[in-house]
Curated annotation (Swiss-Prot):
Compartments in which it is found: Vacuole
Positions bearing the site annotation: Reactive bond for trypsin: R67, F68
GO molecular function terms listed in the Swiss-Prot or TrEMBL record: aspartic-type endopeptidase inhibitor activity; serine-type endopeptidase inhibitor activity
Tissue: Tubers.
Top-level taxon: Eukaryota
Name of protein: Aspartic protease inhibitor 9
InterPro entries registered for this protein in UniProt: Kunitz_inhibitor_STI-like_sf (IPR011065), Prot_inh_Kunz-lg (IPR002160)
Length: 187
């Protein structure tokens, strides 16, 4: 028997709702804090802001609201979902609100988080929310593996989401250590 999936909770202890918007806030004070926001990637020729960043401090501006789009039903720990910045935007930029993992960045030797993803497609736009032992959550980027390997432990293909410094800004990226510990605050 697999245990019942546990719903992901917001800062008020309420279950996340796919129809609501949330800010992703870092756990930590001062420079360890800071909300996640949509910003322009350096050297990007995209017509819309296409980078996923974190403000440099907890006294910075409020982050860009997101919504979580599960494959079905509610929003549970360890389940694949898409993440979309939930902001009004011009038609051209709609796909530039959906999170995905970019190609390998040679300078950082890892993949950076960007927008331009898809919803419900078997590609690099899937994430999971995993609970930390004490407080808060981590985000994982997970390939859509149900086809590749039916008996593999699912998370072995997932990578933790953390931060690299890009042109003085904190950019979300896949990391081996120091993942970003976050909470979800309803907007």
């Amino acid at each position: 028997e697999s245990p019942l999936p546990k719903p992901v909770l917001d800062t008020n202890g309420k279950e996340l709702n796919p129809n609501s918007s949330y800010r992703i806030i870092s756990i930590g004070a001062g420079a360890l804090g800071g909300d996640v926001y949509l910003g322009k990637s350096p050297n990007s020729d995209a017509p819309c802001p296409d980078g996923v960043f974190r403000y440099n401090s907890d006294v910075g501006p409020s982050g860009t609201p997101v919504r979580f789009i599960p494959l079905s039903g509610g929003i549970f720990e360890d389940q694949l979902l898409n993440i979309q910045f939930n902001i009004p935007t011009v038609k051209l930029c709609v796909s530039y609100t959906i999170w995905k993992v970019g190609n390998l960045n040679a300078y950082f030797r890892t993949m950076l988080l960007e927008t331009g993803g898809t919803i419900g497609q078997a590609d690099n736009s899937y994430f999971k929310i995993v609970k930390l032992s004490n407080f808060g959550y981590n985000l994982l980027s997970c390939p859509f593996t149900s086809i590749i390997c039916l008996r593999c432990p699912e998370d072995q293909f997932c990578a933790k989401v953390g931060v690299v410094i890009q042109n003085g800004k904190r950019r979300l990226a896949l990391v081996n250590e120091n993942p970003l510990d976050v909470l979800f605050q309803e907007v």
